[in-house]
Design a protein with these regions (language model features):
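N-terminal nucleotide/polyanion-binding subdomain common to many enzyme families
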Residues: 1-90
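Structural motif
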Residues: 63, 159-160
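Conserved beta-alpha
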Residues: 72, 76-152, 156-157
């Protein structure tokens, strides 16, 4: 994405910029209706990326932001460069604050049953974001279930998942 700097981490571009720069770019993308994916990468996700081809494919064309100290440390030691961390929970909260101001809606997907609903209540109260839907992440891996989940999310009209 424009205006961001990256470091190459084993073939994966990782954002170097601070959180304000990241939020500015994401805000601009939302303003023009641009579709994008963001992953906040910690050491565990970095390990999966390095060892699992499916993870490598999933992270292709994704804006990858350092989440944890472990990844930041590895980049500093291996590549002799510094990156700014932006933990996923903090990014999610900031995106909800942004969405609350711009009237974008959010669909919360993942975790165990009940967690997304509790998060939705908290986020709506704290940020004013409109929650388009919630769904836990525990489901059957069959294709019909996955298609149903995708349809539910798509029909929600959410701008942010």
């Amino acid at each position: 994405m424009e205006c961001l700097s990256f470091v190459d981490f084993y073939g994966l571009p990782i954002v170097k910029n601070d959180r304000e720069a990241v939020l500015t770019v994401l805000r601009r993308a939302l303003d023009v209706g641009r579709t994008f994916r963001v992953t906040t990468m910690n050491a565990q996700i970095a390990y999966y990326y390095l060892t699992m081809p499916d993870y490598q494919a999933a992270l292709k064309d994704t804006l990858v932001i350092p989440d944890g100290v472990g990844l930041s440390w590895a980049i500093r030691k291996r590549l002799n460069t510094r990156v700014s961390r932006f933990p996923g929970v903090e990014l999610g909260l900031e995106l909800c604050r942004l969405a609350g101001k711009t009237e974008e809606s959010v669909f919360l997907f993942g975790s165990k049953p009940g967690v997304a609903e509790k998060a939705a209540t908290f986020l709506a109260q704290e940020t004013g974001v409109r929650i388009a839907g919630c769904r836990h992440g525990f489901h059957n891996p069959d294709e019909d279930t996955q298609l149903g989940i995708c349809q539910e999310i798509s029909e929600s009209g959410a701008s942010i998942l």
